[in-house]
Regions:
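Rossmann-like NAD(P) dinucleotide-binding subdomain of oxidoreductase/dehydrogenase enzymes
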Residues: 1-109
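Intrinsic structural disorder
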Residues: 1, 50, 130, 232-233
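ALDH superfamily catalytic-core signature
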Residues: 65, 71-231
């Protein structure tokens, strides 16, 4: 949705294809644009699954450019479709972005930024810092600080102003996260904290905000894994 602003500023019309699991926020954005006086037909919204909605858009000859943020598999399909009509593309695809920490870094700032980079929006950001590479002389101290602070991250719903991290987008997403953690453990990495679904017991304890009610949300504890190598899945 953030790409709407640059598209309009450059004088373009647009078709916004929102993720199928989060259509309502895009609907609210479109309503706000209409209220601000955006002419009919300049901004357009389509909702639904990528195969049914996004795929035809990337193939349509009247679409001049496709900007996509998401997974590598989908990105390859879009690039292939776009090539048929020589569309321009801007593809921000999935990756494991590293934060590199040197021994002369401002320690507290580095810890805070590493945690924010990893757990902002519960890690559901294409630029999330899901890997941390630490200079060996600083490793133990840095990891200990990460674990200590991760254990204090407040978990809560989207309307809880004290919450520092929120729910995952779906139960399937949580199952995928849990499977990755299990695989890391099986392949020799160490799960230093987290590594399971969050419960009301957690939010009534050190992860609580005092007002946390998980309700029907899908949550996973902030998790720190140590000892991962390039050879691991």
């Amino acid at each position: 949705s953030w790409k709407v602003g640059p598209a309009l500023a450059a004088g373009n019309t647009f078709v916004l294809k929102q993720a199928e699991l989060t259509p309502h926020t895009a609907m609210l954005l479109m309503a706000a644009l209409k209220e601000c006086g955006l002419p009919d037909g300049v901004g357009n919204l389509i909702t639904g699954a990528g195969a049914n909605c996004g795929n035809p858009l990337s193939q349509h000859p009247d679409v001049d450019m496709v900007s996509f943020t998401g997974g590598l598999v989908t990105g390859k399909i879009i690039a292939k479709n776009a090539a048929e009509t020589v569309k321009r593309t801007a593809l921000e695809l999935g990756g494991k972005n590293p934060n590199v920490i040197f021994a002369d870094a401002d320690f507290d700032v580095a810890v805070d930024n590493a945690l924010n980079g990893a757990f902002f929006h519960s890690g559901q950001v294409c630029s999330a810092g899901s890997r941390i590479i630490v200079e060996e002389s600083l490793h133990d101290k840095f990891v200990d600080a990460l674990v200590e602070r991760a254990n204090k991250i407040k978990i809560g719903g989207p309307t809880d102003e004290k919450a520092e991290t929120g729910p995952l987008i779906s139960a399937e997403h949580r199952e995928k996260d849990a499977a990755y953690v299990d695989k890391a453990r099986e392949q020799g990495a160490k799960i230093l904290t987290g590594g399971r679904a969050a419960t009301s017991e957690d939010t009534n304890g050190q992860h609580g905000t005092g007002t946390s009610d998980l309700g029907a949300g899908v949550y996973y504890l902030p998790t720190i894994i140590d000892g991962a190598t390039r050879e691991m899945d």
